[in-house]
From Swiss-Prot:
Species annotation: Pyrobaculum filamentous virus 2
Localization annotation: Virion
Signal peptide start-end: none
Oligomer and partners: Heterodimer composed of major capsid protein 1 and major capsid protein 2.
GO molecular function: DNA binding
Record's protein name: Major capsid protein 2
Amino acid sequence: MSVEVYRQKIEKGGYSAAYEATRRYEREEIEVLSWSSRWESAWSKFGEAVKALGKIEGAPRALVIAKVQEALAYMSKPLPNMKLAMAAAVQAVRACEQLPGMNRERCLDAVAGALGVAKDWIRREMTGGGGGGGGGGGGGGGAVV
């Protein structure tokens, strides 16, 4: 936090405002650090899940990995978007189910383990029990020329 910001805080609200601004900044720093460690933890779990799927080749495996990465990205932001993360997780499970020798439970275990979430969260999204779901999207507009 810059000296100029402190000076403005003191002029506007006294030393208590400057102190509060400092505390808020420190809290944000701690939050960023905790997100950083969560991200590293999520990636290590993802690595374990990829090893579990490592014997399987082909496009569905690549899609599973891509969707798990997408879900991790949504979850690891400072303001996570769990709706989009769970949608990506559902797509990962559905792609995983296409792999030889995999069934829904094994896929749920792998994806939920990689994301560090309860597999019931993903299962609930798959069955449509995730808060009512939105209606279908409208038709796309024509190209603007």
